[in-house]
Every structure is written in structure tokens, then in C-alpha cells.
Amino acid sequence: MENKKKDKDKSDDRMARPSGRSGHNTRGTGSSSSGVLMVGPNFRVGKKIGCGNFGELRLGKNLYTNEYVAIKLEPMKSRAPQLHLEYRFYKQLGSGDGIPQVYYFGPCGKYNAMVLELLGPSLEDLFDLCDRTFSLKTVLMIAIQLISRMEYVHSKNLIYRDVKPENFLIGRPGNKTQQVIHIIDFGLAKEYIDPETKKHIPYREHKSLTGTARYMSINTHLGKEQSRRDDLEALGHMFMYFLRGSLPWQGLKADTLKERYQKIGDTKRATPIEVLCENFPEMATYLRYVRRLDFFEKPDYDYLRKLFTDLFDRKGYMFDYEYDWIGKQLPTPVGAVQQDPALSSNREAHQHRDKMQQSKNQSADHRAAWDSQQANPHHLRAHLAADRHGGSVQVVSSTNGELNTDDPTAGRSNAPITAPTEVEVMDETKCCCFFKRRKRKTIQRHK
């Protein structure tokens, strides 16, 4: 034991302090002698701030820099492991604008851990903060950035396949990137260029649905393999969601998931672009263009950006990052990381504790993940997305965000359809947000 401790101390002494993005580390870490859970040589694990099919999302702290981070934990025995793949995609993306930094990946006890940059609220959170209405200026500033963001992702031979407002985040309040729209959660991403042949993936049909039904392209509903065009079409649907406040295919009722997805797809096809984009002709031009793209075709990103920059200029707007939420008080991350013992293997104990805490004081639980520097009378009405911190919260909803209009959460939830290896129906609390959501049935689909 004495020799092992000395060896460990020596190896820790040899570890250089990471700056920027650090690499993949294969040495396991866990509880220190003080009972604090550590990831890598310098990341202390704090309270759980999110959960999902992947595992848990924890608040963390870099003990070398005193900066807060997000730590994503996935059980090593996961039936559909994806964290290692997501880490590879992040490294493939590198340090582009609006791409969260990844500081560490490696084992942590019985978990794989990925440490990421901590970001601010998602566009869905900000949409709620602005009474679910964005001005044309705000939507154009978002759209111009996200076309560039998607162009960058595509330039790295990846398609995103998970467009939704919860996956686009501003930076931490007070940071120099606080007004930059970031893209996060690459758990559903895919290489569309074969790394060996350097050729585009082949066109296929009868594919399972991957993405979020509310925003996915019409071709995705039809079971066609996704490519670059589908990411851009999904963005167009999201832009109209912000401008309209809702989409015509929200709130559709159906007896089964299959029927619901079918109805959503049918309604998308039946809704003329001119009706969907009424009073926004440039958005109509955008959608017509991306829907006409060939499966293999490279989109003209410059043309699409120019559609919106020209409109921006005609309206006399200035690209000053004065979004609709500027001037509203945004939440800030908690001011302290709680010491936390090693993760328990008994998941039921964690769930029981969380449910008990929630039942005791739901509003206090809502405030637990975030704490304002001063009294905040304008707390977000919506729950803050856990995947805002670069995490991939793969929550699968039986309604997939298209909730019945009589559901109190209708229009507030937007879970992606994932494609794990087997079907499983669960009835436990799944978080696609920082705070605990209401219980709802979830389902996973075959790939």
C-alpha cells in the first residue's frame, strides 16, 4: 500500500497542468483520501445537475484554475455507450468558434467521464425568458451564426442530426463569448464522409428516425439517410419556431408514437412554405432552397447567409449582439462545488433521494443548480438545459416534444429520438434540463 501511494504521488507530480484542451487519459480516478470524487488530476466533481440515458451530468471545478466545468459521466457498462464517440467528434471539431472546449476524457471509477466548458442558457431558456417571442433582429443574428456553425461542423466531415433550441447555448454571463451562440451535444452526430474512402456516405432509405421530430427534415420523416441538407432544413424549422412562437405540427394527438411521428411528418409536407413562412419571404426562400438540395450536394452557405445579412441591412439593423434577452437578468452557475463521495453503484438510492428532495421543496430544488449573485426576481420560467454544458442529454420522450395541448408541459419539452440497440419503455424521471422534469414515459427506437 505504501509503495502504491508513493507511485501514485509520483505520477501525479509528473502530470503537467492542462491548458486549453487536454487529451484522452486512460488512468482511472476516483475518490481521494478526503472523500472527494476527482476526475483526472485536477477536476473535482460536485452536485448532480442533470441526468439522461447517457448517465449523469455533474458540476465540477478545475482545482488548478478555480474555474467551473461540466462533467459528463456515462456508466462503463452502458448498453449503448456513446461518450467516447462524442469525445472523438469534439476533438475532430477542434477549437472553432462556438464549439465548447473539452478538457479531459477518461475513466472515473465505474464511469467514463468527459469534462467540458461550462456554458450559459440555451436558446429555449432564453425564448421562455422573452415570453416565447423573438424579434426578427434576434432571429437573424441567431440564424447568421448558426449557418456558419453548421458549415463548420460539415467542414469537419460531420452531420449534426440533433437541431433543437436546447442544443444552442450562449456563453457564460461575464465571459467574452457570452453573446456567441454555441452548438453542443454531438451524441447523434455522424460522419458523412467515409474516413477511409473519403467518399460521401451512400443514399439509403428505411432508416429509423434520428433527431427531434418537431424540427427534423421532411426526408428524415420519410426514412431517408440524412446529409448536410437535413441539418439546414431543421435549422429553418427552428428559425420559424422562434418567429412564430410555435409550429403547425405541434400538439398533434395520436394513440401511438408511430402515429404521432407520421402525423408530424404529414403535417410538415402538407404545410405550404408560403403559409409556414408568412410575412417572412426570406425564410421561405431559405426553406425552398434547402429542401431542393440533392442528398450529396454541398449547400451554398454563403448564399444562405447573404439572404439574411441583406435583409438585416435593409431593415437597418446593426449586428451589435443586442438580443431580446439583453437587459434581462440571467442566472449564473452556483458559487460552490459541494464535496461529493464516490458515485454509488446503487442508482435507486440516488433516484429516491432526488425524488424525496423534489417532493419536499420543488422550488428550492429548481434553484439548487443555479444561484444568482444577487436577488433575482426574474428567474427563468423554463428549466435550464443540462446539455447546455456540452453534455449530450439523450432523453427520449414518448411524445418527443409534441405534447398534447392539454398537457401542462406542452410546447416546453423537446426530446430527441435516439436510436439505441433495443427498445425499452421507462417511467422514471429523466432530465433534459438542469432541474427535474415531470415524469413522462420514454421510449428508445431500433436503429
UniProtKB/Swiss-Prot annotation:
GO terms for biological process: endocytosis; positive regulation of canonical Wnt signaling pathway; protein modification process; signal transduction; Wnt signaling pathway. Keywords: Acetylation, ATP-binding, Cytoplasm, Kinase, Nucleotide-binding, Phosphoprotein, Serine/threonine-protein kinase, Transferase, Wnt signaling pathway. It is an enzyme of class 2 (transferase). Monomer. It catalyses: L-seryl-[protein] + ATP = O-phospho-L-seryl-[protein] + ADP + H(+); L-threonyl-[protein] + ATP = O-phospho-L-threonyl-[protein] + ADP + H(+). Residues 22-35, 394-416 have a biased composition (Polar residues). Residues 1-16, 347-369 have a biased composition (Basic and acidic residues). It is found in: Cytoplasm. This is Casein kinase I isoform gamma-3. The modification N-acetylmethionine is found at M1. ATP binds at I49, G50, C51, G52, N53, F54, G55, E56, L57, K72. Its main location: cytoplasm. The lineage of its organism: Eukaryota, Metazoa, Chordata, Craniata, Vertebrata. Autophosphorylated. One of its GO terms (molecular function) is protein serine/threonine kinase activity. GO terms for cellular component: cytoplasm; nucleus; plasma membrane. The gene is CSNK1G3. Residues 43-313 form the Protein kinase domain. Serine/threonine-protein kinase. Casein kinases are operationally defined by their preferential utilization of acidic proteins such as caseins as substrates. It can phosphorylate a large number of proteins. Participates in Wnt signaling. Regulates fast synaptic transmission mediated by glutamate.
